[in-house]
Amino acid sequence: MLDQRRHQRIRFSVPQKISIGYGGEIGEGVIENLSLSGLMMRTPMPLEISRNVGCEFSVFDSPLIDVPAAVVSRVCDLFGVRFQQGPISQILIDDAISAALASGKASILSVHEMGGRKTMRITGGLCGILRSDFMHALTRMGVDEIDLEGVTAVEQAGLALCLVAANRHRVTIGAQSPCFAEAWAQALTAPGPLEKLVTGT
């Protein structure tokens, strides 16, 4: 589990706050996405690449995670940091990610290719926060099938994305978790209004 998620980006249904220690000051930010190896965050603090920062955050109801990190990228107020963690903080981060995915409060979207076919796999919450990544995979990368076996919670905005994929892009809806299968069956009875959440038409 640890190795599989080391570089997978986890997005949250509700933005998670983070406290940042830098240059003797404490500032605030918001986590954009999280992996075992680091995170992306937005903050007004003037962080500099290659400098060290202290990161303190919790993921929903997780214990407080306090980990040092190095700033590795910046685009405007969006910073990427790589954790300099020990085994305890790594376990805390993995446990927090696992709990958030199981509850549907966090999501992973990944694309895998096998035998010339591309499969989009969604784990955790099928929600509107995935729209940008979902549509990029659908329209830029080309997807043949969507694997939803790992979905633990479903939002209407997420169902709308799947309807657009199936009806307008002829993508196959593959493996399904019980909660997705139930919501999908209901969505298929009246797909029009849901699709409008994505297309506006």
PLM feature spans:
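N-terminal helix initiation/capping motif
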Residues: M1-L34, I91-I108, H112-G116, C127
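Short strand-loop-strand
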Residues: V14-I49, E56, V75-G80
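Short beta-strand-centered aromatic/proline hotspots
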Residues: G29, I65-V72
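Extended Gly/Ser/Thr-rich low-complexity repeat segments
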Residues: R51-F57, I91-A102, D133-F134, T139-R140
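Short, charged beta-turn/beta-strand-edge "cap" motif at the junction between a beta-strand
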Residues: F57-P63
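C-terminal output/interaction extensions
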Residues: L78-H112, A185-Q186, L194-T201
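Amphipathic alpha-helical interaction surfaces in cytosolic regulatory modules
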Residues: M120-K196
